[in-house]
Amino acid sequence: MSEQGKLILFSGPSGVGKDTLLDILIRKNPNFQKSISITTRERREGEVDGVDYYFITPDDFEAMLDCGEVLEFAKYGKNLYGTPKKPVDKWLAEGKSVILKIEVQGAAKIKKMYPDALAIFIMPPSMEILEHRLRRRGTENEDDLVRRLSIARDEIEKSRDYDYIVINDSLEAAADEVLNILSKE
């Protein structure tokens, strides 16, 4: 029987580079498994079902909630986002390290269910750099950008509840720091 895997909670403000960091980590360590969230939102151009998210209907989402198949969920605007329970438990039982890219409220819920989970907060070098990254991404209008930056400030406030804080000033350096943290845990 294989040793139980490690659950890693990966949070940080929108635009901090979580997805890119996750891709680097998984490339560097094939034992890492990225959990894919479910969502009721429309698929964006270039997104692939089962790779970026599992895109499901609101009725299917509600059915999964009713059956206890969702570890945690949150509503953003009109859309629901959640973490499916079955694949996470399967990968942990197989000895894989499972990384959940998750917002701070969800991380707090998961930490209560899985107290041994390791929580890592990805921090921008500064709010100015974060704003620049979000503007460069070009996916938000000005109102959305202001809202995201306000949410980012709130999330950064809660970063003290995490086991580790990693500043993403350089993707490779941040990835190496996360790998170093995980090798010690």
Model-derived segments and their meaning:
Residues I26-S35:
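Post-Walker A helix-loop "phosphate-sensing" segment adjacent to the P-loop in P-loop NTPases
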Residues F10:
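Hydrophobic anchor at the beta1->P-loop junction of P-loop NTPases
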Residues S37-V98, V104-Q105:
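ATP-dependent small-molecule kinase phosphotransfer cores
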Residues V16:
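ATP-binding Walker
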